[in-house]
């Protein structure tokens, strides 16, 4: 062995004139050593050990003792070259004679992949390079499919402790491992002061048949460089065989302090989780621990053995807890559904339920109120368009508004229905644009309380004011300006089942089961054929007995019977053609319903319900009823009638004649209804709309005029 005193460098500092000359000599020595090594490498085997891929450069001062020991034995039959000696440091020409005195390292045969423990060997200082190769090369690693990545990225070591870095042997063989332990994928950087004993720990043992490895330490916390000397003193985690899903308990590990990192790995690795199909993710997100308490973080085992668990312990992500320190988790049984934890609201549970119940109750009450306001119409609905008024009488039809639509909804013991042929536009008149918020002039009642609706939004309409002719339509002529005022102190409709009440020119047409009731028509007697416990709808009217030419038609509130008292001037009966002051011919075929369509002549023909109201009024009768005002204490109603008189005068008589009810039929009310009458005091038949080209589609049963 050569000593330092026996070295004879070519250019020494004593023989050189200056320091620059000594540096030049050292550079020349390094170049000569590199050239010599290149010639030696060409004679070696094809594959060499990767332990010396990048050897640190050594200074020329310590180069004489660098190769005093055995060189590595030759490596033969290796598929991949050993990168350990690809780039060997240059040696001085003084020590070149003893460079090959020792045999090469033993061959590493049958190795598919070489251990990457020393793929990247950090450069060491030239002062400590003399003891860099005092030990033999690592033993061969045969038939290893994938090597342990425990030392893929080795931390940089200081040049002071590099002399004993390769003392540890290479990791043992890990055969048939599909996926290696990821515990040390990312190794924390260590300080150069404690790097001398870092690789002393053996590599992790074999992990056979593990499909997915423990991810407990995917992200290892950074450790301080002061306590890194004993980090790897303990063994790697035990094998986890046949685990399909790994424990997610510590996916995100809390950051640890640098002061207490020395005992972080003192405890054993997690216990094996075998045959676990679904693993509890209860602690996916672990709370971050403080830096001072990190020394006792891993004193306990990290995971719990879960064997043959099929059900998940579900941590509901949608559950929001007001307390952020608590995690809302629900264990789900095998046959049970997920129990969700709903977020807490500022409103208490009782208040929330109360508000929901209040909303539902209000909705039901609204619907109930609509039910009470709806008039039951079984089969007959009479509209303004289907009314016939004698043009000579000057009486115009009722102008019903949109609000009547809601009042004519059908009610049959809690069941609602509308006729399919109902056309809602029939309730709209030609002068609705001129009227300010007209409502129905009908007083509705559903078995209990009557609802009085004013036609023009007047408050005291049914509280003492006389119901003038403006309610039912008037004409500009003064002699017939106040025609048939409907006098009713408190008009109310009595409830009955299976019937219909309508207003046609001061007349309530009641379509009963066996007959027709016409009430509140002056100068006419109407009888009720059928009366029961719950009878037809009828308008309760109180007529002033001072009238002479008009009959008083009363309906009993209890029985619904019509009490008609003809006047002394009117002695005619129903069923006779009367040539009196008021002649009303009502012909009803009460088997089917009346269509609501304005232009549905076909529907009228199908249903066969025709109501003809031909009124012939003389000046004598008008004179008797002109100043008829049964309401006491109200003398201003006449001016209101005059105000509303012009509003309804715009309806043309030709439009009235073109309606479906311009035809007069006298099926059960006498023979005089079908006779041709004069404009004053006589009846008049309508013109048949079904007569085309000299042929009527109704046949011989048609009683209308065929021009």
Swiss-Prot record:
<keyword id="KW-0862">Zinc</keyword>
<feature type="compositionally biased region" description="Low complexity">
    <location>
        <begin position="579"/>
        <end position="590"/>
    </location>
</feature>
<feature type="compositionally biased region" description="Polar residues">
    <location>
        <begin position="112"/>
        <end position="129"/>
    </location>
</feature>
<dbReference type="GO" id="GO:0003677">
    <property type="term" value="F:DNA binding"/>
</dbReference>
<keyword id="KW-0863">Zinc-finger</keyword>
<dbReference type="InterPro" id="IPR036855">
    <property type="entry name" value="Znf_CCCH_sf"/>
</dbReference>
<feature type="zinc finger region" description="C3H1-type">
    <location>
        <begin position="682"/>
        <end position="707"/>
    </location>
</feature>
<feature type="compositionally biased region" description="Polar residues">
    <location>
        <begin position="561"/>
        <end position="570"/>
    </location>
</feature>
<keyword id="KW-0238">DNA-binding</keyword>
<feature type="compositionally biased region" description="Polar residues">
    <location>
        <begin position="246"/>
        <end position="260"/>
    </location>
</feature>
<protein>
    <recommendedName>
        <fullName>Zinc finger CCCH domain-containing protein 20</fullName>
    </recommendedName>
</protein>
<feature type="region of interest" description="Disordered">
    <location>
        <begin position="1"/>
        <end position="290"/>
    </location>
</feature>
<keyword id="KW-0479">Metal-binding</keyword>
<dbReference type="InterPro" id="IPR000571">
    <property type="entry name" value="Znf_CCCH"/>
</dbReference>
<feature type="compositionally biased region" description="Low complexity">
    <location>
        <begin position="8"/>
        <end position="22"/>
    </location>
</feature>
<dbReference type="Pfam" id="PF00642">
    <property type="entry name" value="zf-CCCH"/>
</dbReference>
<dbReference type="GO" id="GO:0008270">
    <property type="term" value="F:zinc ion binding"/>
</dbReference>
<feature type="region of interest" description="Disordered">
    <location>
        <begin position="624"/>
        <end position="647"/>
    </location>
</feature>
<feature type="compositionally biased region" description="Polar residues">
    <location>
        <begin position="30"/>
        <end position="52"/>
    </location>
</feature>
<feature type="region of interest" description="Disordered">
    <location>
        <begin position="558"/>
        <end position="605"/>
    </location>
</feature>
<feature type="compositionally biased region" description="Polar residues">
    <location>
        <begin position="81"/>
        <end position="95"/>
    </location>
</feature>
<feature type="compositionally biased region" description="Polar residues">
    <location>
        <begin position="279"/>
        <end position="290"/>
    </location>
</feature>
